[in-house]
Amino acid sequence: MVEQTAQPPAIRDREAAIQAGILIDVTPTALQLGITFPVTITRPLWEVGIVTNQALSEEDQTSRLRDILMAFRLRLAGLTTVSPLIDFPVLLALPPSHVPQPVPLFALIQADPTHQANVTLLLPNEVSLSITSLN
């Protein structure tokens, strides 16, 4: 007898991914920084880049989120042509270090029926998974 492993259903809808906790909607903060379209962050990026495994105050977490969003906004402003996948560096102190280091991140830009686009910010190791799931 072959044992079957239950696979979770593929989540292809942005709202369903937010409800499932796979994506974190950071659109309100993005709007404060002049980003005019919906923005989400993947759960792994949220856990590594925003909340970390150190005890950070809510103010520190908000500051880290704003740093990531501003780095994305500055990269976007410097582009003459926008592609569906954009790399951008951000300075973050990743535990256990307290010294900010350049961290490569990516933005996956997709068409959105109600906005021009929506963006998901993710870690480099999540890029191939995202591209595979789009195919």
Task: Go through each PLM region and give its residues.
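Arg/Lys-rich, positively charged N-terminal/basic patches that mediate binding to nucleic acids
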Residues: 2-63
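Functional cores of ribonucleases/endoribonucleases
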Residues: 53-130
